């Protein structure tokens, strides 16, 4: 009997031990329970939940931390659960935080963002960086390492060292080394040799935090360290100056492409036909407003609306240009003063018409996603995508117009009329028709320029006035009627403006460029690339 009792007691103890150990083998909390802990009013409880979420290993953990940081993680009062939210029509568009399933739309008061303080924000940033260090994507690991530059947190530095020991990607390893070397400069425990090695390694870095860390060692007691810091800062300054020059040149090319688009249509109407069209800026404005109207007609089509706006702007501005030539300009050939006054009056009419139709207020055009953002080459030099696209677009328009004038029947007739109008008429070319088509072509290209300008500035009735003078300067400087001269002049003036602006300011830079062109025209009245042969004789 005692043996049976002892055996039963032993089995009972084993069962109790097994039951006590079994919960330890299973997760004590699920991801849903962690999210529910964020409802607590205690910031300490939220800190624990954030830490658990970051270390959960769940594929949605990083996105949920980002949503919490951006105040997009909400408490839905109706269901009393944590959801994701996006602003929509004054309310919230709700989504499941894990599956991202649509949960419908609620009023603004029906859901409240989870509140966090600055301490929790820093905790999230640090945890995101630690999670990012173990991301399979090398670019994400590099970004995480870079985001930790300047940190003094021992746990984060330990995580960086652990990652560095097994990192096989060169760029990621370099980013981690930069962060660790910067930490060595801030550390009171690092010896002189360690700091000197760190300074040497950081001497080529362009990170602002690295520069600040180096400056913090300028008051070091060790002369060798001060000298090393000064040498490193000089190297950084030299590299920064080179990239700033490259940045200035890029903005100069960007301005040059805008001037090219604005002036290339004028190069046809003024250069080929000899017509001083003061309404050219308003034709650019019509192209910009066409872009605005297309986006209003297709409110959900911002990503492809430019593909519709470009031909639409060309046709609308070109049609208006043909009307101007047919009803006004054709009666004023050979009378430049009257032409100037008439086109100036047309420009005022177009401006007032736009004010009546669209109101005098500026209108904004939404930039497509594929034109937004920038190509970040390093911390001090980046190329914005919208300007890169506009440079490429300007060159495409230039080459297209060049092919039209050189390889098509219309181009042949335009060149014939521009060289000798009477002979062209004698050969059966209808010069009045060619005049209308040429004016329409130049006006259409002005409209296309307006599409590009709408991506850089607000669309308003006075948009064209900002470019009409610059357009005439480009055409005159490059050589009247010469497209290659227009290209060279546009980029030359654009780069010159941007090189002068840091020294003299934007207004004085334009004045200096204008004075230079006046002096240049005194020396070479026909511009950089004057017409030759019969066209020059005309």
Locations of regions flagged by a protein language model:
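Alpha-helical transmembrane segments within multi-pass membrane transporters and channels
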Residues: 303-346, 353, 488-493, 524-525
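Cytosolic-side transmembrane-helix boundaries in multi-pass membrane proteins
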Residues: 332, 338, 342, 357, ...
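Single transmembrane alpha-helix segments in multi-pass membrane proteins
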Residues: 248-293, 323, 327-338, 477-483
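Helix-loop-helix "hairpin" substructures at the membrane interface of multi-pass membrane proteins
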Residues: 383-459, 488
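Inter-helical junctions in multi-pass inner-membrane proteins, predominant
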Residues: 248, 404-405, 409, 438-481, ...
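Membrane-embedded helix boundary and interhelical linker motif in transport proteins
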Residues: 279-323, 503
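Transmembrane helix-bundle core of multi-pass membrane transporters
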Residues: 339-407, 434-437, 511, 535-538
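Extended repeat-based scaffolds of very large eukaryotic assembly and lipid-transport proteins
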Residues: 21-212, 216-246
């Amino acid at each position: 009997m005692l043996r049976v009792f002892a055996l039963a007691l032993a089995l009972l103890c084993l069962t109790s031990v097994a039951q006590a150990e079994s919960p330890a083998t299973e997760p004590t909390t699920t991801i849903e329970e962690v999210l529910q802990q964020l409802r607590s009013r205690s910031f300490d409880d939220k800190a624990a939940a954030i830490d658990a979420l970051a270390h959960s290993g769940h594929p949605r953990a990083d996105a949920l931390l980002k949503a919490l940081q951006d105040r997009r993680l909400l408490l839905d009062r109706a269901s009393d659960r944590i959801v994701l939210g996006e602003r929509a029509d004054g309310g919230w568009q709700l989504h499941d935080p894990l599956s991202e399933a649509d949960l419908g739309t609620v009023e603004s008061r029906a859901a409240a963002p989870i509140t966090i303080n600055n301490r929790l924000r820093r905790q999230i940033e640090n945890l995101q960086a630690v999670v990012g260090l173990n991301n399979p994507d090398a670019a994400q690991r590099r970004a995480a390492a870079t985001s930790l530059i300047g940190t003094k947190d021992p746990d984060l530095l330990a995580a960086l060292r652990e990652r560095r020991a097994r990192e096989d990607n060169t760029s990621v390893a370099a980013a981690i080394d930069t962060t660790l070397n910067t930490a060595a400069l801030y550390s009171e425990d690092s010896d002189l040799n360690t700091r000197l090695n760190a300074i040497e390694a950081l001497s080529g870095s362009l990170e602002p935090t690295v520069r600040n860390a180096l400056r913090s060692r300028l008051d070091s007691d060790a002369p060798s360290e001060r000298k090393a810091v000064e040498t490193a800062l000089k190297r950084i300054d030299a590299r920064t100056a080179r990239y700033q020059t490259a940045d200035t040149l890029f903005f100069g090319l960007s301005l040059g492409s805008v001037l090219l688009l604005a002036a290339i249509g004028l190069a046809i109407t003024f250069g080929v036909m000899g017509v001083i069209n003061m309404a050219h800026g308003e034709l650019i404005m019509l192209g910009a407003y066409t872009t605005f109207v297309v986006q209003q007609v297709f409110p959900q089509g911002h990503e492809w609306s430019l593909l519709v706006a470009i031909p639409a702007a060309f046709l609308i501005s070109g049609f208006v240009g043909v009307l101007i030539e047919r009803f006004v300009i054709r009666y004023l050939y050979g009378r430049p003063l009257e032409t100037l006054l008439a086109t100036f009056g047309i420009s005022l009419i177009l401006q007032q018409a736009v004010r009546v139709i669209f109101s005098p207020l500026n209108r904004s055009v939404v930039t497509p996603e594929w034109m937004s953002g920038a190509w970040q080459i390093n911390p001090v030099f980046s190329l914005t995508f919208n300007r890169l696209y506009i440079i490429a677009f300007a060159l495409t328009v230039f080459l297209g117009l060049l092919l039209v004038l050189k390889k098509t029947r219309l181009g042949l007739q335009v060149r014939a009329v521009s060289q000798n109008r009477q002979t062209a008429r004698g050969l059966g070319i209808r010069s009045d028709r060619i005049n209308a088509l040429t004016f329409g072509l130049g006006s259409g290209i002005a409209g296309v320029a307006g599409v590009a300008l709408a991506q850089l500035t607000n669309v308003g009735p006075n948009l064209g006035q900002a470019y009409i003078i610059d357009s005439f300067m480009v055409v005159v400087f490059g050589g009247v009627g010469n497209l290659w001269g227009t290209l060279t002049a546009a980029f030359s003036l654009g780069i010159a403006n941007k090189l002068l602006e840091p020294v003299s300011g934007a207004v004085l830079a334009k004045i200096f460029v204008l004075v230079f062109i006046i002096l240049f025209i005194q020396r070479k009245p026909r511009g950089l690339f004057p017409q030759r042969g019969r066209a020059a004789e005309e």
